[in-house]
């Protein structure tokens, strides 16, 4: 049985092989930059990739949908720009020539890190890792999507300076989570 995928925008069931959502009208083609996964890609048979949110030297962060439960997730793709050459039309990521061993080793480290975080969350102040998926010659960490406001925006919107006691109280669960990770 083929798993139905959900539109990453309106979360309604998509017919097979569509390039736009018949419900909300959003077009999937060309939404993400070259080298990233296309909107509407399926991972692990249960996650639909949405738009790229950010990218850094380690990889790309996408919005996404968990198709079985119908809830939003964040998908972190391991894509080290210094080691990765290109992504084929089949979405397979290829390492740069001469970087194959380092690419494979660091890919395994990425998977190990997110498996370790998965074991200690959600009991800590860290974002829960729901799944770790290996596909396309790389690894994807599927994270809970809590929504919310980014810290820099929240701080900019505050009229008063954040007191040290407030900052410590807010960050205590994060510190405890990091400490648990290093045990």
Regions found by a protein language model. Give the residues of each.
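A short, low-complexity linker immediately N-terminal to eukaryotic Hanks-type protein kinase catalytic domains
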Residues: 30-49
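Protein kinase glycine-rich loop
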Residues: 50-56
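ATP-binding glycine-rich loop module of kinase domains
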Residues: 67-111, 115
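Activation-segment/catalytic-loop signature of the eukaryotic protein kinase fold
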Residues: 131-132
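Conserved short submotifs of the Hanks-type protein kinase catalytic core
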Residues: 135-150
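AlphaC helix of the protein kinase catalytic domain
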Residues: 151-162
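Activation segment signature within eukaryotic-like protein kinase domains
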Residues: 170-171
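Protein kinase catalytic-loop region centered on the HRD/HxD motif
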Residues: 174-183
């Amino acid at each position: 049985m083929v798993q139905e995928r959900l539109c990453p925008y309106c979360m309604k069931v998509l017919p097979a092989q569509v390039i736009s959502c018949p419900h909300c009208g959003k077009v999937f083609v060309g939404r993400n930059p070259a080298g990233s996964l296309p909107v509407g890609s399926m991972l692990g048979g249960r996650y639909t990739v949405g738009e790229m949110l950010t990218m850094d030297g380690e990889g790309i962060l996408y919005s996404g949908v968990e198709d079985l439960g119908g809830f939003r997730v964040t998908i972190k793709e391991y894509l080290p720009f210094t080691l990765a050459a290109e992504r084929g039309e089949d979405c397979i990521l290829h390492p740069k020539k001469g970087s194959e061993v380092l690419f494979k080793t660091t890919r395994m480290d990425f998977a190990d890190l997110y498996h370790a975080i998965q074991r200690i969350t959600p009991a800590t102040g860290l974002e829960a890792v729901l799944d770790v998926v290996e596909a396309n010659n790389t690894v994807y960490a599927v994270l809970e999507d809590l929504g919310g406001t980014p810290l820099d925006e929240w701080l900019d919107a505050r009229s008063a300076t954040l007191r040290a006691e407030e900052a410590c109280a807010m960050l205590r669960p994060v510190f405890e989570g990091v400490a648990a990770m290093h045990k």
